[in-house]
Amino acid sequence: MGSKTPEEQIPGGNGGPPSTGPSSSGGEPRGTHLSRDGDGSLGDHGDDDDADEDDVSSRPLRADVEEKKKKKRPKKKKKPAAAKEQSSPPRVPLSDLFPLGEYPAGEDLVYDRVPQPDANTARTTTAELRYQSRKHLEDPALLNDYRKAAEVHRQVRHWVQEAVKPGWTLLDIATGIEDGVRSLLANQGIEPGDNLRSGMGFPTGLCLNHETAHYTPNPGQRDVVLQHGDVMKVDYGVQVNGWIVDSAFTMSFDPTYDNLLAAARDATNSGIKAAGIDVRICDVSAEIQEAMESYEVEIRGKTYPVKAVRNICAHDIKRYRIHGGKSIPFIRNNDQTKMEEGEIFAIETFGTTGRGKLYDDIGVYGYGLLHDAPAQVRLPFASANRLCKTIKEQFGSIVFCRRYLDRLGLDRYLAGLNCLVSHGVLESYAPLADIKGSYTSQFEHTILLRESSKEIVSRGSDY
């Protein structure tokens, strides 16, 4: 889920000083090991020279009975237990597929260079103090939560890539994704607190063509049907105990747009490769733009250079907060802010054949509690107070959409939502689009900046 650049803000504002020099320019397939019982083999008795030994009539009766007892019937071959596999659509809980509760790690990349901290004479630097507060990133339980969320994302998107075809409505696709996520997590998210334990990290984004980010089908909107010539961005998050995996990909059914998709995929991988401890934001941005703008795409006989989108950014992630505060633009900038050990980033990129600057489109994608919202606020409507209580119990600071309120059985909530937005309790997110007639693409991964390597936790065999 992209972080929108504030209006009129020059990229380079993560709190870092301006640059004084030039910028330097994703589990193995699972099955269960099946065991079989071998046939009991008695073998052949050796011959004996004593002929009397072979004469059955000369044996005592008791010995004959004992001989019968010794004979064993051949064991029946046991049928191998059926290997547990994910269904289509995905509905088998992950706990059934991973009975030990251990989930596959993402791709592990060693840092290109050893981080060199700035020289200072303080006994404990502010960076070290910040890291101490993020030491939990090496906690096995946290890592397993992240890997579980990533495995859910991989299995659900595998179904999307295999099953979704032109003719599907965006509502059917979004519902299929979200039903799959909830089924794999074995949590339908109905009771208070359920959605805080696990569930969607934010509403499923399904953006066609010039629509670039933050669109999801909501109640009252017309059905949008996927066409063969559409370019669809699929962006959704999965969270376990508040740790959000944010990953996105682009689908098209016409090879005309292959280069547009390749540009965003390459730019995202370039950003991931450049990212690391003590790496400056401006250096990651430069690598992203260089990769993105090395591509062009021919559409209906006209060649378009692929541009990096200017006013939406990659971002860090905090617990229960999809946008943590740091931003990584897709264009060169002077931001000297450093990435730090223990941080979590959603490295994403958007490419476009349009202007490269997005505008707010009509409608509302979703809502989220502002992290600095007042704890107590006087609202003019009792319904708004009840709605606020429900949102805090069900979602906390996780972004949600109106479809999610419908699932909970709420109605007549629009006035309450508008009231909460106007009183600074909720933030609303608008769809973002480039000029009509243009096409955009997106790819995204979540990475963990661990002590000795970066883990691309959402990496799969697909991208």
Curated annotation (Swiss-Prot):
Binding site residues for a divalent metal cation 1: 235, 246, 444
Cofactor note: Binds 2 divalent metal cations per subunit. Has a high-affinity and a low affinity metal-binding site. The true nature of the physiological cofactor is under debate. The enzyme is active with cobalt, zinc, manganese or divalent iron ions. Most likely, methionine aminopeptidases function as mononuclear Fe(2+)-metalloproteases under physiological conditions, and the catalytically relevant metal-binding site has been assigned to the histidine-containing high-affinity site.
Positions with a binding annotation for a divalent metal cation 2: 246, 315, 348, 444
Biased composition (Acidic residues): 46-55
Enzyme class: hydrolase
Ligand binding (substrate): 214, 323
A GO biological process held by the record: proteolysis
Record's GO cellular component terms: cytoplasm
Pfam families from the UniProt entry: Peptidase_M24
Protein's cellular compartments: Cytoplasm
Names of required cofactors: Co(2+); Zn(2+); Mn(2+); Fe(2+)
Positions with biased composition (Basic residues): 69-81
EC number(s) recorded for this UniProt protein: 3.4.11.18
Positions of the UniProt region annotated as Disordered: 1-98
Catalyzed reactions per annotation: Release of N-terminal amino acids, preferentially methionine, from peptides and arylamides
PROSITE patterns membership: MAP_2 (PS01202)
Keywords, comma-separated and alphabetical: Aminopeptidase, Cytoplasm, Hydrolase, Metal-binding, Protease
GO MF terms, alphabetically ordered: initiator methionyl aminopeptidase activity; metal ion binding; metalloaminopeptidase activity
Gene3D superfamilies for this protein: Creatinase/methionine aminopeptidase superfamily, Winged helix-like DNA-binding domain superfamily/Winged helix DNA-binding domain
Skewed-composition ranges (Basic and acidic residues): 30-45
Biological role stated in the UniProt entry: Cotranslationally removes the N-terminal methionine from nascent proteins. The N-terminal methionine is often cleaved when the second residue in the primary sequence is small and uncharged (Met-Ala-, Cys, Gly, Pro, Ser, Thr, or Val).
Stored NCBIfam families: met_pdase_II
Family affiliation: Belongs to the peptidase M24A family. Methionine aminopeptidase eukaryotic type 2 subfamily.
Protein's name in the database: Methionine aminopeptidase 2-1
